[in-house]
Amino acid sequence: MNNRMYLQDLVQGRYGRKIAYTSVDKITADNVVKVIGECIGTFYYNKSVIRYLWNYYKGDQPILYRQKLTNEDITNRIVENHAYEIVQFKVGQTYGEPIQFISRKDDEAVNKAVDMLNDFMADANKQEKDIKAGEWQSATGTSFKAARPKANSDVPFLIVAPTPMNTFSIYNDSTEEPMLSVQELKDENGNWYKLAFSDTTSYKIQDGKLIESKLHTYGGIPIVEFPNNHERISDIELVIGMLDAINNMQSNRMDGVEQFVQYWIKFVNCQIDETEFEKMKKSHALTVKSNNGDNKSDVDIMTQELNQTQCQVAKDDIWDNTLSILAIPNKQGNTGGDTQGAVELRNGWDFSKTRAKLKDPIVKSAEKRLANVVLNILRVNDNDLKL
């Protein structure tokens, strides 16, 4: 589905991704089908919005389907993909450097084990998956990372970043702790099924029936959600109205330029046939003749140029507000004798760092869950780090 409509028309004011909750205290083979059935509607609702935001991030934006009622022969559709710029900045801010685990104990054995864990993560190319999941996280409001065993390898585990368009988590409505992670997948015959993980058991469900249930050794839910914030609001949807306005303004500006170039010629009190007019255009000269002294003939070019300066001022104002809302520094350089600290304060870098700190606890909490799963996989594969 193309992004022909605006996001507001899709979400009807319900911004942020819905969170799936259950009231059960323990997931079992007896209730897992019911729990997933009660939450699947939330997943499908989120899926449509996530698809819209992901395609918007990649450049499929409503301006591309713009229709005009007047002068429809001059219809420019310009996408200034600031959504991509925003997401890349946010991802670089959080995941630009590899995430490192550190020890809070002054213990040589613990410090050495933590260093080994960091080495395992580096060998598993975790940062690449961090960036991939970070793009989903910023663009759509949530993302997932998972750990799974890898046989016959120096690194006995894989880090993967499944798409939130086929993955969701279910939380307990009183403790807000994750109870279940679910993936909607296809088998080799093209049949849909759901693969779910609790902290102790994996479940396979097909056609509304539980067809497989078995214990796992992950030591926790192996698929971990990494929300962008507690409301799962994406960085794009916070300012999407202004991004659409910039696209519309730039498209109209190009229309104005094209209409100025493709001018109309007005003939007053004279008639020129098409053949004669084409000859005149080639020679860049016009000859007209007045019928009488009272009705003088004249030829004029009808143009009305758009005030580009005023348009740029309005556009800059919208973009400055966008950067302010997202706490992204502007690109103004140091034009005076300011110190580096003064430049950072003036251009918004300090504010940007403060905003980024609000996201750190969310990422740390999710990383701890993922690290526990990795440690259990290592333990099962005779690489117990004793952490």
Please place each PLM-identified region on the residue numbering.
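Extended, helix-rich architectural segments
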Residues: 1-157
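Charge-rich, acidic-biased intrinsically disordered regions
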Residues: 11-40, 47, 109, 150, ...
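Short amphipathic alpha-helical segments
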Residues: 109-113, 121, 125, 129, ...
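A short, surface-exposed helix-loop junction/capping segment
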Residues: 111-118, 295-301, 349
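Extended, regular secondary-structure scaffolds
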Residues: 131-232
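Short, charged/polar micro-motifs that form catalytic or ligand-binding hotspots
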Residues: 135, 301-312, 353-360
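Extended, charged amphipathic alpha-helical segments
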Residues: 212-346
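C-terminal structural cap/anchor segments
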Residues: 321, 325-385
